[in-house]
């Protein structure tokens, strides 16, 4: 998991004129490779691969009945 750490003591700068005001400091993320998740590390598809889909297996016992009733009925307005 990423840790948020300050840049260093030389990067710290006081904020405001009063001594009772806190300090604002910059911070950075360590190990940002996994920050956006695994999906970001994929390469974009090649031009010939755009629009091609993988085969999908439908595991529904009723799909044959549903598809049959859809083809038997005429769409409304036709």
Swiss-Prot record:
Gene disruption phenotype: Knockout in a spontaneously hypertensive rat model results in decreased blood pressure and vascular reactivity to N-omega-Nitro-L-arginine methyl ester hydrochloride. Increased renal and serum endothelial nitric oxide synthase and serum nitrate levels. Reduced fasting plasma glucose concentrations and a 23% decrease in visceral and brown adipose tissue relative mass, resulting from a decrease in adipocyte number.
Signal peptide feature range: none
Annotated InterPro entries: Camk2n
GO cellular component, one term: synapse
PANTHER family: CALCIUM/CALMODULIN-DEPENDENT PROTEIN KINASE II INHIBITOR 2, CALCIUM_CALMODULIN-DEPENDENT PROTEIN KINASE II INHIBITOR 1
Lineage, opening ranks: Eukaryota, Metazoa, Chordata, Craniata, Vertebrata
Function of the protein: Potent and specific inhibitor of CaM-kinase II (CAMK2). Plays a role in the maintenance of long-term retrieval-induced memory in response to contextual fear. Modulates blood pressure and vascular reactivity via regulation of CAMK2 activity in addition to regulation of left ventricular mass. Mediates the NLRP3 inflammasome in cardiomyocytes via acting as an inhibitor of the MAPK14/p38 and MAPK8/JNK pathways, thereby regulating ventricular remodeling and cardiac rhythm post-myocardial infarction.
Keyword Glycoprotein among record annotations: no
Gene Ontology terms, MF aspect: calcium-dependent protein kinase inhibitor activity; protein kinase binding; protein kinase inhibitor activity
Subcellular location as annotated: Synapse; Cell projection, Dendrite; Postsynaptic density
Protein name in the entry: Calcium/calmodulin-dependent protein kinase II inhibitor 1
Family: Belongs to the CAMK2N family.
Source organism (scientific name): Rattus norvegicus (Rat)
């Amino acid at each position: 998991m990423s840790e948020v750490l300050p840049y260093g003591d030389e990067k710290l700068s006081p904020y405001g004129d009063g001594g009772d005001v806190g300090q604002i400091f910059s911070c950075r993320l360590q190990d940002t490779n996994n920050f956006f998740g695994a999906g970001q590390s994929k390469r974009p598809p090649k031009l010939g691969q755009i629009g091609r889909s993988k085969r999908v297996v439908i595991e529904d016992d009723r799909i044959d009945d549903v598809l049959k009733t859809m083809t038997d009925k005429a769409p409304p307005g036709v």
